[in-house]
Amino acid sequence: NLYQFGNMIQCTIPGSNPLL
């Protein structure tokens, strides 16, 4: 789950990562 990592990079969608 990339929720925590996504949150660090200002990801508004749980489990979603802009870098991916």
Curated annotation (Swiss-Prot):
Chief location category: secreted
Catalytic function, reaction form: a 1,2-diacyl-sn-glycero-3-phosphocholine + H2O = a 1-acyl-sn-glycero-3-phosphocholine + a fatty acid + H(+)
Required cofactor names: Ca(2+)
Signal peptide: none
GO MF annotation, one: metal ion binding
EC numbers: 3.1.1.4
Protein name: Phospholipase A2 D5
Family that this chain belongs to: Belongs to the phospholipase A2 family. Group I subfamily.
Organism, scientific name: Micrurus pyrrhocryptus (Coral snake)
Localization, UniProt: Secreted
